[in-house]
Design a protein with these regions (language model features):
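Bacterial N-terminal signal peptides that target proteins for export
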Residues: 1-6
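Cleavable N-terminal signal peptides
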Residues: 8-9, 19
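N-terminal signal peptide c-region/cleavage motif recognized by signal peptidases
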Residues: 14-16
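Bimodal "functional hotspot" detector
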Residues: 19-161
């Protein structure tokens, strides 16, 4: 009888445990970035238990502001580019995200042209944005994963900054 009761309790609480699960991501520690510019990408969590790589990237782009440790910055929102000429009319980066494709150890992040406000900004902003995206992807795949960026259907090989 006790085993049945324990099983019933476990089954009843299982959906709540899943709802409270977090996903590991990598975000920049703004103080470390300002101090040394090195070793500033650190592991933290966002709320939600994302199962696919596309879900994890979507969660990173949309929920990074909900991180538990506020010393980490969330470089995917207009505040991150407020000091640059790209800020006028900028939306959060997730508004420009069109999904991803995987082919073996290759991941292609797909965006519309307006994503260049973040992806082709100053070198520092590019480091924060792309660094967090690429490190999070490698956290959930293999370290040898290569990340490419597709803007309006074209793979971008070189960035301005």
């Amino acid at each position: 009888m006790n085993a049945r009761l324990a099983t019933a309790i476990l089954l009843a609480t299982c959906p709540f445990a899943t709802a409270l699960a977090d996903t590991k991501v990598v975000l920049p520690d703004s103080q470390r970035f300002a101090d040394t510019g090195r070793d500033f990408l650190l592991e933290t969590t966002i709320p939600g238990d994302f199962k696919t790589l596309e879900g994890i990237v979507w969660g990173l782009l949309t929920l990074s502001s909900k991180r538990p440790d506020k010393r980490f910055s969330s470089p995917f929102f207009p505040d991150a580019i407020s000091s640059t000429s790209h800020r006028e009319g900028a939306q959060p980066l997730y508004m420009y995200f069109r999904g991803l494709r995987q082919d073996g150890s290759k991941v292609i992040l797909r965006f519309t042209g307006d994503a260049n406000r973040y992806l082709n900004n100053t070198a520092a902003i590019q480091e924060l944005v792309k660094g967090a995206l690429e490190a999070t992807i490698r956290l959930h795949t293999t370290k040898s994963t290569t990340v490419y960026y597709e803007i309006d259907g074209q793979i971008v090989e070189e960035w301005d900054a």
